Amino acid sequence: MQNNSVQQANISIMSSFSGSKKVYVEGSSSDIQVPMREIALSPTTGSFGEEENAPVRVYDTSGPYTDPEVTINIQEGLKPLRQKWITERGDVEEYEGRAIKPEDNGYKKAKPNVSYPGLKRKPLRAKAGQNVTQMHYAKKGIITPEMEFIAIREHVSPEFVRDEVASGRAIIPSNINHPESEPMIIGRNFHVKINANIGNSAVTSSIEEEVEKMTWAIRWGADTMMDLSTGKDIHTTREWIIRNCPVPVGTVPIYQALEKVNGVAEDLTWEIYRDTLIEQAEQGVDYFTIHAGVLLRYVPLTAKRTTGIVSRGGAIMAQWCLAHHQESFLYTHFEEICEIMKMYDIAFSLGDGLRPGSIADANDEAQFAELETLGELTQIAWKHDVQVMIEGPGHVPMHKIKENVDKQMDICKEAPFYTLGPLTTDIAPGYDHITSAIGAAMIGWYGTAMLCYVTPKEHLGLPNRDDVREGVITYKIAAHAADLAKGHPGAQIRDDALSKARFEFRWRDQFNLSLDPERALEYHDETLPAEGAKTAHFCSMCGPKFCSMRISQDIRDYAKKNDLSEAEAINKGLKEKAKEFVDTGSNLYQ
């Protein structure tokens, strides 16, 4: 592990955007400090003088990386923000934990210099007979510091947060062994969230690249991260990511379990899988994607599909079921998995192993048969007070999207829905971040709680840093559009502020209020790079004479100067121009 290269790679990430600063809103106690990004705005100027514009505060996922007062050494990890809250509840205990084995990283014998140097504390687990999930506390009527933190972030009451979690309509992914994470919530009555996938593979990428991608993704707005590593150094890569990640981290444990049996699905066992769950639980993974709904009798339903089974986890479990001609150990041992989850407060992300991989397969019998089983498993998890969200498709044309949400809400009793897109057409490799963002905005509007991003590299290759940025921004647009359509409180404040800045030609404010300030500035400066252009009352699209907003502004100024309404000003101006035309000889061409 080249520690210096990781540190160097993150230097550019550890800064806020231009015109912004990190601010904190304090809760009921001094240790509840909720981060927000405050965007300063310049005053409105005109013939009337100056009028101040209040700063705009926006949701911030970047963690302490963008706080100039915080020094971060990624070899040591972030400070354990939630450690005191977790231990003060008195229901957890330290223990030695399992020893790290060479096979955890995909080796037959230990490889030197790949372990994470920073973690010194022992793992935590629930004391015997205790349940440490946020859902358990919520059902008991307890408002935790995590819930209060979230209430401030979401501009709702702590009691509302508690009630949504208790009902199962929302989850707070918060493993007690990931105290570095800043509490967040996933539920349809809150801001639509987005997830970014990272992870190495047997073909490409490294620990350095994945840590950099993580910090890069949260800078641009990723609400959670999923580490989907499948190559070597899986355990160590995950440790580096979790120790330095201020947002929840999810995984698909079957990927690592498969590596431990050299990629032979038939050789997987419950014992190997269980050991992998505990390994990742002790590291601090906040939610597990588990494809427990892939049943033996559902596999034949995929035989006539255009694209068969496209989920990696789903294909692994289908292969195991066929080889052993029995139901998967994920299904038969589901209650035991629940026992593990509630010891660490890990949320289920019940995987859609039979999701459609093409629009031709959307909403078919296999997809909805699995959904019925996910609904049954949700009820079992809730009996253990384990938090659950449900994964969804996939590839779905626009006219079939709403049916997915309606069925999921009914069958899974409003557990949060977490979808990959969906892609609304299959003809645009290289642009699937766009084909999927169309579906993501729609499904978010209908009630999906979290959207898994898609990058331009989808179906083509492993995304690099630039692809991650493109995917995150694209999905922030989709999520925000859904928030606006749902009428989420305060969602339109930023839009209105940017629209006002645009009308008043406050170019710097326009850049700073945008989801990607750097791209907005870059595109503006390609044609108008001079500093004076940042105050000009036009852009290169229309030029100074044809700018509709400048003309509108001139009308307003004229109306104010002549004590007229805007309609009267337009009418008066038309009469003056008509008289000017007649006075100059009524010639069309001068």
UniProtKB/Swiss-Prot annotation:
Binds 1 [4Fe-4S] cluster per subunit. The cluster is coordinated with 3 cysteines and an exchangeable S-adenosyl-L-methionine. Keywords: 4Fe-4S, Iron, Iron-sulfur, Lyase, Metal-binding, S-adenosyl-L-methionine, Thiamine biosynthesis, Zinc. [4Fe-4S] cluster binds at residues 539, 542, 547. It is an enzyme of class 4 (lyase). Gene3D superfamilies: 6.10.250.620, Radical SAM ThiC family, central domain. Its EC number is 4.1.99.17. Zn(2+) binds at residues 395, 459. One of its GO terms (biological process) is thiamine biosynthetic process. Disruption phenotype: Cells lacking this gene do not grow on minimal medium or on 4-methyl-5-(2-hydroxyethyl) thiazole, a thiamine precursor molecule. They do not synthesize 2-methyl-4-amino-5-hydroxymethylpyrimidine. Pfam families: ThiC-associated, ThiC_Rad_SAM. One of its GO terms (cellular component) is cytosol. Its cofactor is [4Fe-4S] cluster. Pathway: Cofactor biosynthesis; thiamine diphosphate biosynthesis. GO terms for molecular function: 4 iron, 4 sulfur cluster binding; carbon-carbon lyase activity; zinc ion binding. It catalyses: 5-amino-1-(5-phospho-beta-D-ribosyl)imidazole + S-adenosyl-L-methionine = 4-amino-2-methyl-5-(phosphooxymethyl)pyrimidine + CO + 5'-deoxyadenosine + formate + L-methionine + 3 H(+). Substrate binds at residues 197, 226, 255, 291, 311-313, 352-355, 391, 418. Belongs to the ThiC family. HAMAP family: ThiC (MF_00089). NCBIfam families: PRK09284.1, PRK13352.1, thiC. Catalyzes the synthesis of the hydroxymethylpyrimidine phosphate (HMP-P) moiety of thiamine from aminoimidazole ribotide (AIR) in a radical S-adenosyl-L-methionine (SAM)-dependent reaction. This is Phosphomethylpyrimidine synthase.
